[in-house]
Each structure stands twice: as structure tokens, then as C-alpha cells.
Amino acid sequence: MNLFTPGPVNISVAAQQAIGRPRMFHHRSDQFRTMMTKLTSHLKNAFMTGGEVLTLTSSGTGAMEAAVSNLLSPGDRVLVPVSGKFSRRWAEICEAYGIDVIRTDLEPGDAPDADVIISALEADPEIHSVLLTHCETSTGSLTDLEPVCAAISHLEQASGREILKIADCITSLYVDELRMDDWGIDCAVAASQKGLLSPPGLAFVALGKRALDRLESNSSSAYYFDLWRYLRRKPPFTPAIPLVDATLASLEYLAGLGPEAVWQAGRSGAAALRLLAGAAEMKPVARRQASGVVAFWTEGLDTAKIGRALEREHYIIVAQGQAELKGRILRASPIGKSPAMLRGFATAFSGVLAKTGRTLDMDSIRAEFDRLLEDCAIWE
């Protein structure tokens, strides 16, 4: 089955081989400690941080909850720009912990820019943290974190406030450009099943100096997600050892390719999918578009029927719209997809659309499509 979903994605050959190895370590053994040390080193390089990166056995939402429960306290006031299902999740987690959430609601496909963020922060001096979503997976929109974080830092310097910058990078790590330290991100969270080309089940919390300082001064109500436990003893509980093995193997593979080549493959793969959608007269949902997922409006089409046909006839799975976008959009991801996979998707998508009466004019885009696929050859 070819997963064109924005997570889980098809895992790398390196991860497959690691899972297939008939070995198991005890989580207190020297062998496993060595494995965790290597994993953490690669994760620091992936986030581009000199801070701490902690590995949890959970989904990405677990990393989000760990960040909230350890860095924030009941009654704290935070800003959450909401542009879709996953940015809304930040707000829902915060509210579950008794945190006072100031929401900035955006239209589907929009992403918060520096002006929106700064306006909200200036209007309320009690806000001391901003929870951002790098890639809003429900719409494919990308928040430009570099200028947003720079604007927040400038406001901090001018006002004397400390405003923690916390980012969901679950669909952007090793997909879109991410430079945690250079951009001034204090805490970033991610998971194994997307850009790391690994099975689901591991989540990561990257902490810069200011986040570590906040962690030290904050009283957490968490137990399993108490990050001090992970800092003192890595890991504090029995981890998913085969997943650590597989994710380390995949990170070593990605490191060999280099982040710039991986980011470019993501950009070009996403552009190729947008080209296909455009040739079928489908418009993108996002104004500023991420590489990890391409979402496009499907006006006049039965999205569920298209999804079923792709799966049953071509063994390709795409994602439907969620919440208020259900039945209105389709979502596809180019993460880890080779030129052959993308060409196969183009053929299948064109054939399925033709049965609905919608034409995908492949001849008009073939030259540009093939040019974009050259950058995706790293996945062959």
C-alpha cells in the first residue's frame, strides 16, 4: 500500500531493515544507552539545536501535552493562533490544564504572520507564551516561523517581557526548513511517523535554554510526561525499543542525504502534487503552502468516492478533509516519495478523476512535472 497520507508515511528501507533485525535490548543496558545517545545526537541535528531533545513513547499529541504540562501552569495566559484542527489542538490541551487561552482565529488555509501575532501580544501584556503550528496538517498551510519568532524576540527586547515560543513541528521536521536555535524557538515538538520516515510511536520534545529554565521554575502536574524524569534518567520508563532502533536507522539515512537535499525534495514533491491538482482545476487550500501535505478544494467531486477508488484500484491512500473541511478537500503528501511513486500517483489520480468526468490535462504540465521530480530522485 502506498501511503500518500501526511502521516503515517511509508517508512524508509533503513527503518524496515532495523525492525526486521531479530534483536532486543534491555532498556537499561549499555547497548541501548549507546543507541539512545546516537538517536539524541541525530535529533539535535534534525531540530538544529544545541539544547536537549527528549524521546517519549507516544504520539505527537503526547509531546504537545508534555510541552504544555511542563512549561505552563494553570492560570497562565497564552496566545494560540488557530487556523485548523491541529493548531486548535494546542488550545484544547491548554484548556484541559486550566490555562487561559487567547485565540486568534484564522480562515482555513491562512497562517498567522508576524503582524497578527504582535498585535495580539501588544493588546495583552499578560500573555507569556505563544503556541505555534509550523505546518497546519489539516489545510497544508505553513507558518513562516523565522520572521514570526524574530518579531516576538524584538517585542521582548523592547518591552522587557519574556514570551516563550513553542512550536508544533510534527509535520515539518525533516520536511520543511527548520532551524530551532537560529530562529529563536524555545520548544519544538515532533514525532517519528512523518518526515523521519519511521513507524508511529515515538515523540520528541526539543528544549532550548529558556524552556529548560521555565521547566525548572514550573511545577508540573504530569507523571508519565514529567520531563524532569526524562532529563534525569533517559528513558525513565520502558520505551518502544524496536521503534528507537528503526528511527535511529532512518535518521542515519536522512543525515547521509543532508537536510538541504531533503527540504528541496519536499518542496519539489509538493509542487508536483499542486501541479497535478491545478491541471484538474483544483485550487490549493493554503495561501502559504507547506511541503509535508498538499490540500486542494474538490468542489463538485465526491471526495470519499475518489479516496475509495484510489485505494481499491491503485493501492494508494490519500487523506480526506477533517472537521469543517470534511467532504470539501483532499490531502496528499509527497514525503519520501520517489519519481516513480509520484508518476504512479499521477496516472492513478488522472484515471480516477476521468471516471467522474473531470479531466487532468497531463500533457500541459508534463515537462514541468518531470523537472520537479528530478529533486525527488534522492528517495529512489
Language-model-detected regions and their locations in the chain:
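PLP-dependent enzyme catalytic core of the Aspartate aminotransferase-like
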Residues: 330-380
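Conserved PLP-dependent catalytic core of the aminotransferase class-I/II
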Residues: 38-47, 251-285, 308-309
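Active-site phosphate-binding strand-loop segment of PLP-dependent enzymes
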Residues: 112-174
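Conserved PLP-anchoring active-site segment centered on the Schiff-base-forming lysine
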Residues: 72-88
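Conserved PLP-binding active-site segment of the aspartate aminotransferase-like
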Residues: 295-300, 317-347
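Conserved PLP-binding catalytic core of the aspartate aminotransferase-like
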Residues: 283-313
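Active-site C-terminal subdomain of aminotransferase-like
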Residues: 10-11, 193-275, 377-380
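Conserved N-terminal alpha-helix of the aminotransferase class I/II PLP-enzyme fold
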Residues: 18-66, 89, 93
